From Swiss-Prot:
Cellular compartments per GO CC: cytoplasm; excinuclease repair complex
Pfam short name (any one): UvrC_RNaseH_dom
Subunit-level organization: Interacts with UvrB in an incision complex.
Entry-linked CDD domains: GIY-YIG_UvrC_Cho
Protein name per Swiss-Prot or TrEMBL: UvrABC system protein C
Domain named GIY-YIG: residues: 22-100
Family matches, as PANTHER family: UVRABC SYSTEM PROTEIN C, UVRC/OXIDOREDUCTASE
Gene Ontology BP terms: nucleotide-excision repair; SOS response
KW Lyase (keyword) present: no
Protein's cellular compartments: Cytoplasm
Length: 608
């Protein structure tokens, strides 16, 4: 890889790492050929992946790994345990080169029901394809041991390694061991338990291991109650602990669920008119063993249904999926042989769909953040396009102007106009207005005066007009602005921002008669509108306070006879406020304006 390419890759990876979510999940490192070279788990994806690229985290093997990374993928999950299980499944599937080099390839244990005449049940870390049944893997060892212990207490099973073939048993080759004498084994080795009876127990054990433990749970609960009734509290407590563990075992996770087998899960998230993101999860034997999110660039304004259909065909072909059930978020017009489409409303399937949606939304957000960092103008364009779409504007709102009034019972009435260009404050274009024609507290008349003055002047000076006017208020404010637009024969869209009782932006109004526009709170667009409203309020109220303060200062000194403008200016320059002049000693005031005037000032302020 040449130096320029290395620099591009480095910047690309930095962009991904800086936008990783601070959530549990797994991450995958890919080389330049697109091969997964490492899979890892993390409680906090951003912190963990960042550690590989920090200078202090550079042992030899890690340096080699980091030098090979050309791309990073990740999957968000809901818990650390889910991340452990998913990491294990993906390592087994992809066998990444650097997982072997960098860490012990830990295999989570499973429970094996051995394929033999009298099957043994035991934990193992090795999967041998000899017809035996395997259940797991288990990331939580206590749960696994609780299940094994439960099985041990419910069913007498052999634990020996003897070859219990019918011929060997008939030949009398074996003797019972200690397990028989302590009633842990029924003695099939000497013919004391038939294969039929033994296999009946094995069939029930397999049901437990599949997660069908409701009946066993009921038995444990009953046993716990019986022991408590017999005042055997210590034994009851032990059974209670087992009951709690089996109940924990029964609770299913989003990543591993013993009742879900061979299912595909798809979700989609659009990015305006440009593209759509699709997430694909493949569930095999209750575990996620495929996860992929990809982007479709729209060419012919395709619908979500059309894009999702394309995505389903593409992913099933790419991953050779033969799943007979596909979970989707909405109805789509597609028929596949022997395939059922499900839109889940509750339960484990609903959780899987939510997990897929979580991943596709996170992927979309991360892609947008990366793009906006590379091109800051892109964020502004996206927000302006959103406003255009939500309000059905004819053109992009490149310039937005917002008005607000401020007064206290009609005194010191002022107004302000803030200007946002390309979704950013343009402070050099902000304007303050003293209300000239309105007497008393009349917000509507004040708004009308200021809007008329601003746009009358803009017309006369041929200044650029805004693409959208926003009022800091509801329907009444919008109506007076509309009247001015009609009077000046201007066609500028008008929106209103209403506040709740706590003076927080609560809704966006548009149209005549004004209608509430459903913009999701806390979305980037809503935050922009909230910023505009907060900014015009701040600007107006600051101007109002300044004006009120100057009036109060002026009136206090103006009422003192014999004090001219030069004296007032000198005092305010030194002491900054009337309050400080009043608090100063006569000597301090005399040093500025002389003793005789100082006495007049002090007496005048004391009597004010």
């Amino acid at each position: 890889m040449d130096t320029n390419q290395e620099l591009k890759t480095s910047e690309y990876l930095k962009g991904i790492v800086s936008n990783l979510p601070e959530k549990p999940g797994i991450y995958q490192y890919l080389n330049a050929e697109g091969t997964i070279i490492y899979v890892g788990k993390a409680k906090n994806l951003k912190r963990r992946v960042y550690s590989y690229f920090s200078k202090e985290h550079q042992p030899g093997k890690t340096r080699v790994l980091v030098s090979k990374i050309a791309d990073i993928r990740y999957i968000v999950v809901n818990s650390e345990e889910d991340a452990l299980l998913l990491e294990n499944n993906l390592i087994k599937k992809y066998k990444p080169r650097y997982n072997v080099l960098l860490k012990d390839d830990k295999t989570y244990p499973s429970i094996c029901v051995q394929n033999e005449y009298f099957p043994r049940v035991f934990k193992t870390r090795r999967i041998i394809r000899n017809g035996s049944s395997y259940y797991g893997p288990y990331s939580h060892s206590p749960s696994m041991h609780a299940v094994l212990d439960l099985i041990k207490h419910l069913y007498p099973l052999r634990t020996c390694n003897l070859n219990l073939s019918p011929e060997n048993i008939r030949a009398g080759k074996f003797n019972v061991c200690l397990e028989y004498h302590i009633k842990n084994c029924a003695g099939p080795c000497i013919g004391l338990q038939s294969q039929e009876e033994y296999l009946k127990n094995i069939a029930e054990i397999k049901e437990i291991l599949k997660g069908n433990t409701q009946e066993i749970s009921r038995l444990l609960y009953q046993r716990m109650q019986d022991l408590a009734a017999e005042m055997k509290f210590e034994e009851a407590q032990k059974v209670k602990e087992k009951y709690a563990l089996i109940e924990n075992y029964r609770s299913k996770s989003e990543v591993v669920s013993s009742v879900l087998h061979n299912i595909d899960v798809f979700s989609i998230e659009e990015d305006g008119e440009k593209s759509a993101f699709i997430n694909y999860l493949h569930i095999t034997n209750g575990a996620i063993n495929q996860a992929f999110t990809f982007e479709y660039k729209k060419k012919l304004n395709e619908t979500k249904e059309e894009l999702l259909t394309l995505g389903i065909i593409e992913m099933r072909e790419r991953y050779k999926s033969a799943s007979r059930e596909i979970i989707v978020p909405f109805d789509i017009e597609i028929e596949l042989n022997d395939v059922t489409f499900t839109i889940p409303q509750r339960g484990d399937k609903k959780k899987l769909l939510e997990l897929s949606l979580l991943n596709v939304k996170q992927y979309k957000a991360d892609r947008m953040k990366q793009a906006e960092k590379l091109n800051p103008e892109q964020r502004s364009m996206r927000l302006m396009k959103e406003i255009q779409q939500e309000l059905h504007l004819d053109r992009l709102p490149m310039q937005i102007e917002c008005f607000d009034n401020s007064n206290i019972q009609g005194t010191d009435a002022v107004a302000a106009c803030v200007v946002f260009k390309k979704a950013k404050p343009s402070k050099s274009d902000y304007r303050k207005y003293n209300i000239k024609t309105v007497v008393g507290a009349d917000d509507y008349a004040s708004m009308k005066e200021v809007v008329r003055r601003r746009y009358q002047r803009a017309i006369e000076e041929e200044s650029p007009l805004p693409d959208l006017i926003i009022t800091d208020g509801g329907k009444g404010q919008m109506e007076v602005v509309r009247q001015v637009m009609e009077e000046l024969q201007l066609d500028i869209p008008i929106a209103g921002l209403a506040k709740d009782r706590k003076h927080r932006t609560s809704e966006v109004l548009f149209g005549f008669p004004p209608q509430t526009i459903g913009i999701k709170q806390h979305s980037p667009l809503f935050r922009l509108l909230e910023q505009i409203q907060d900014e015009v309020h701040r600007f107006a109220i600051t101007f109002h306070r300044d004006k009120r303060s100057k009036r109060q200062v002026a009136s206090a000194l103006d009422n003192i006879k014999g004090i001219g403008e030069k004296t007032k200016t000198a005092l305010l320059k030194e002491f900054k406020s009337v309050k400080r002049i009043k608090e100063a000693t006569i000597e301090e005031v005399s040093a500025i304006i002389g003793e005789s005037k100082a006495k007049i000032i002090k007496e005048g302020l004391d009597n004010h």
